[in-house]
Amino acid sequence: VIRFVTSASPKRVMAIGQKTEIIQYEINTYDSIQCIIEWEMLNGTKFTETILTSWIDPESSSAISDQKIKFIGTSGRYEADQKERGIRINTDNVGVLHINPDFCMPYGYNDGDIQWRGYGIDSITTFLNDVADLEDGLKNISDLQENRPSFKESLISTMVTDAAHKSLKNGSQWEEIKILK
């Protein structure tokens, strides 16, 4: 998401992990990993991202998974909460917005018709519309390459994940990332 929003490139990665719970079950993996990624924007500005990930959650948790993402910048903040199915944006220019708080919701009309809306539905219809436009010759792959997730772009997150894995193996050392053009 960071790459898609900022067009920045990851420069280096460092990860630290803990093995205390799962190892008791003779599974040699991390319970929790903290990862710091240094990014560089096209104008040379650098910033960091912190990722916290864990397999460990209380049995009493209200969801099978609890995923959140926050971008905190100089003039604003973006927060998405998978469990609550909500997105909150707070910027100096606009203030607080609670955008599309649910995955999908039914909207009723005066004629009794119901239409489902929300980012869950919208993402699927966008994909299907793109496929139809490709088939009809209204768009080509290069049109979508810049404004849709792509296999090419997925290589960036794969490189970050690989660098985090190497960092864990190398005593939490910084691992440089070389982006291929």
PLM regions and their residue ranges:
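C-terminal hydrophobic helical "lid"/dimerization subdomain
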Residues: 154-166
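Active-site rim elements
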Residues: 20, 56, 110-115, 143-151
